[in-house]
């Protein structure tokens, strides 16, 4: 969702004079916060998920489905309920926040989950409650689905319908496909971001996704944009054999699943940030769920590169298309991409790609007492300009506010995010795991969340290290998006498990990883083991669970989640992307030309909706699992958690 500040957002031309000021004071704010809270210790493990949902409207007579632009109306009702509960002293089961599009809402648990394994047994139940809470407010024909809508940008894809205005200079996006009304209008952040990204870049964003070449797909596949009313931008930008898109909404209008963890202190947060980073491509491949864009089958299964291009505000100079004149750097990546550096001291030698940063900002951080590795990370983020400046919020007290820092931090969308505590808050140092595609059902989303959280427990308990050169991560994220990557791609990964008390980490920050310690592995080998040097992540998790204090129901639920992910990794169960491809290919109206028409999408989403509601089973996608998820943690377990909290506070 990002930072939602109240005020008057400045257009890009009015933002430019404040860019250096915002950066300088954003760094000053981080330095002040760091020194105030760097010694914070003893925070309990807390975590939570964020799921983005799409509201759709089925027209059963016309056999078509559209996105329903009622998010703002629904949010008013949902948030009114939150406020009422707060006044009455009642616990909120879940919280609701706006997202980029007028058809999207973001749901989170009402309070973070705690550190006990029993918390895993309430996750799925909470997700079920979220759907039910929204469903009660929906109109006839509407449904809430945790999917990325496959027909974004096609004619008449919204309810009610609106027309794009590519030749309107007052349009936020000037898109050929994506009307301004589809951007969430309840907060100025989203429309202002669309406008400022376009204006900073100097033209519309250009998204080109390789099209899936079916037997009847034209070769070359080329759309004709010569008559488009956008000054020739589409005709120049669209690539042959690619699906062309031209708006932030094609990326940020896709739904995702994210998990945030609170660490015990800043050192653990930095360490977890590094250790989870190599896992991000694995989860991207495992969660593949987005094979269709603009009603065309793509040759990728993920939204990752689409989002990256959809917010790419780099100028022609920064993209290396013309010599540098007004800008400082040629930037290799969009501001939405993979992380370029590790931040824990032991990981420094694995930062094997050049890191760009402004020397002045880096010096400000070093002079402010920030260590070299963290200073590089922050300075690298601050090569990006702030895209969102509010007129009333320019002057701030840098010792009390972090708004200028968050303005830049929250618009650097990486696969991992290191999150300092908010000012004057009980919240501690956190890391956010960001690559996962949202899944169709609550069971799947709960399984992926619990997998990642349990992995952090294994990492911390066994002190295992999965670090590999950061350049390998960049390559892995490219491979993980490809069609059927979970079965057909190999990812660079550690040959065997090392610990932070054994070589290479024990040798300190100057250690290096021998080249033959990194090998190519399938996702199945990473998850389930290769029978040789690498035991597999889930066997390690089961080993951890065998020695953990966990109640029977929670162990049963977690075991089913792990078994499910093992079968996804092995190919015994399909990813949603694979399931969708199969459904489309077998549909009688599909002409094997890569085009997925209205009726096909209607039938497919109707089937998906019934699966997500539990009205029909889908063994190919989900197997035959049934967890013991419950909305409440047993009282005995809750008391044990309270004792853990008290014990932790005494130790700190």
Swiss-Prot record:
GO terms for cellular component: glutamate-cysteine ligase complex. Its EC number is 6.3.2.2. Gene3D superfamilies: 1.10.8.960, 3.30.590.50. GO terms for biological process: glutathione biosynthetic process. Pathway: Sulfur metabolism; glutathione biosynthesis; glutathione from L-cysteine and L-glutamate: step 1/2. Keywords: ATP-binding, Glutathione biosynthesis, Ligase, Nucleotide-binding. It catalyses: L-cysteine + L-glutamate + ATP = gamma-L-glutamyl-L-cysteine + ADP + phosphate + H(+). The keyword Transferase does not apply. One of its GO terms (molecular function) is glutamate-cysteine ligase activity. InterPro entries: GCS (IPR004308), Gln_synth/guanido_kin_cat_dom (IPR014746). It is an enzyme of class 6 (ligase). Belongs to the glutamate--cysteine ligase type 3 family. This is Glutamate--cysteine ligase. It comes from Onchocerca volvulus. The gene is gcs-1.
């Amino acid at each position: 969702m990002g930072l939602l500040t109240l005020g008057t957002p400045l257009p890009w031309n009015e933002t430019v004079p404040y860019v250096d000021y915002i950066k300088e004071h954003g760094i000053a704010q981080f330095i002040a916060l760091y020194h105030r809270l760097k010694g914070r210790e003893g925070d309990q493990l807390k975590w939570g998920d964020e799921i983005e949902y799409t509201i759709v409207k089925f027209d059963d007579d016309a056999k078509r489905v559209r996105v329903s632009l009622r998010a703002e109306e629904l949010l008013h009702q949902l948030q009114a309920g939150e406020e009422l509960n707060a006044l009455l002293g009642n616990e909120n089961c879940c919280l609701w926040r706006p997202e980029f599009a007028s058809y999207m809402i973001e749901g989170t648990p009402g309070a973070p989950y705690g550190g006990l394994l029993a918390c895993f047994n309430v996750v799925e139940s909470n997700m079920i409650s979220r759907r039910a809470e929204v469903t009660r407010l929906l109109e006839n024909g509407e449904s809430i689905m945790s999917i990325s809508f496959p027909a974004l940008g096609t004619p008449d894809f919204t309810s009610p319908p609106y027309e794009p205005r590519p030749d309107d200079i007052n349009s936020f996006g000037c898109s050929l496909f994506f009307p301004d009304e589809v951007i969430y209008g309840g907060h100025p952040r989203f429309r202002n971001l669309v406008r400022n990204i376009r204006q900073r870049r100097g033209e519309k964003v250009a998204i080109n996704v390789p099209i899936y070449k079916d037997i009847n797909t034209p070769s070359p596949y080329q759309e004709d944009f010569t008559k488009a009313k956008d000054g020739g931008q589409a005709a120049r930008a669209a690539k042959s054999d690619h699906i062309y898109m031209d708006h932030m909404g094609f990326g940020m209008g896709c739904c995702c699943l994210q998990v945030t963890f609170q660490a015990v202190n800043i050192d653990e947060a930095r360490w977890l940030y590094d250790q989870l980073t190599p896992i991000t491509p694995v989860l991207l491949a495992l969660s593949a769920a987005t094979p269709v864009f603009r009603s065309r089958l793509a040759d990728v299964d993920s939204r990752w590169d689409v989002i990256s291009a959809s917010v790419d505000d780099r100028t022609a100079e920064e993209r290396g298309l013309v010599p540098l004149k007004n800008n400082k750097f040629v930037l290799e990546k969009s501001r939405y991409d993979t992380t370029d550096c590790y931040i824990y001291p032991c990981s420094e030698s694995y930062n094997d790609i050049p890191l760009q940063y402004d020397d002045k900002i880096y010096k400000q951080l070093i002079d402010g007492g920030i260590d070299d590795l963290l200073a590089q990370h922050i300075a690298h983020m601050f090569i990006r300009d702030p895209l969102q400046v509010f007129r009333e919020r320019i002057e701030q007290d840098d010792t009390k506010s972090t708004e200028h820092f968050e303005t830049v931090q929250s618009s650097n969308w990486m696969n991992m995010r290191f999150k300092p505590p908010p000012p004057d808050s009980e919240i501690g140092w956190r890391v956010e795991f960001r690559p996962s595609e949202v899944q169709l059902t609550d069971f799947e989303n709960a399984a992926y969340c619990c997998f990642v959280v349990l992995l952090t427990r294994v990492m911390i308990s066994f002190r295992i290290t999965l670090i590999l050169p950061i350049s390998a991560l960049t390559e892995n994220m490219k491979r993980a998006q490809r069609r059927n990557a979970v079965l057909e791609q190999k990812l660079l990964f550690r040959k065997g498990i090392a610990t932070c008390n054994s070589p290479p980490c024990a040798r300190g920050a100057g250690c290096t990883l021998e080249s033959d310690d990194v090998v190519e592995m399938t996702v199945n080998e990473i998850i389930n083991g290769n029978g040789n040097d690498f035991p597999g992540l889930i066997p390690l998790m089961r080993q951890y669970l065998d020695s953990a204090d966990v109640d029977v129901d929670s162990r049963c639920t977690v075991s089913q989640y792990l078994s499910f992910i093992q079968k996804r990794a092995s190919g015994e169960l399909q990813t949603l992307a694979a399931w969708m491809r199969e459904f489309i290919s077998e549909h009688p109206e599909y002409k094997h030309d890569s085009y997925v028409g209205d009726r096909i999408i209607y039938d497919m989403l109707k089937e998906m909706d019934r699966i997500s509601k539990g009205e029909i089973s889908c063994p190919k996608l989900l197997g035959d699992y049934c967890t013991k998820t419950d909305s409440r943690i047993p009282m005995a377990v809750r008391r044990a958690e309270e004792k853990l909290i008290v014990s932790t506070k005494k130790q700190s």
